From Swiss-Prot:
This is Small ribosomal subunit protein uS7cz/uS7cy. One of its GO terms (molecular function) is rRNA binding. It is found in: Plastid, Chloroplast. Coiled coil: none annotated. Keywords: Chloroplast, Plastid, Ribonucleoprotein, Ribosomal protein, RNA-binding, rRNA-binding. One of its GO terms (biological process) is translation. NCBIfam families: rpsG_bact. The lineage of its organism: Eukaryota, Viridiplantae, Streptophyta, Embryophyta, Tracheophyta. It comes from Welwitschia mirabilis.
Amino acid sequence: MSRRNTAKKTKRTEKSDPIYQSRLVNMVLNRIIKHGKKSLAYRILYRAMKQIQQKTEKNPLLVLRQAIKEVTPRLIVKSRRKSGSTYQVPFEIKPNQGKILAIRWLLEASRKRLGPNMESKFSSELIDATKGKGKAIRKKEETHKMAEANRAFADYL
């Protein structure tokens, strides 16, 4: 059976959202979704962006990008077993994976935050992240500290 004329797979691209035309906003949106309720996720995200606009008087898309950039980790630690012992081995991660982790940490931190609704908690967490504060920033620093402490095991890949 010849493989010469097989169909080429096209690379899947993420769509951009209708208002901001940003793939990053769409990535955040898809991580907000719970139980398939995309319209609720849209409402939460767009209201949070509106609150950011009112609080900071800056472009909310720039604030979102800055917050994700501040929270994005460069290193993570993974458990590896070697001769009966488990080591926390630091790994460098790809930029896209770091971005995904940053979005996840921002959402986790905003869900744990005290506040009346998800929109205000998420907008506050994003604003804090741009200022270098907040639980998501603390999570990144904690991860980097753990990677630095276990740097001796970096060759146990």
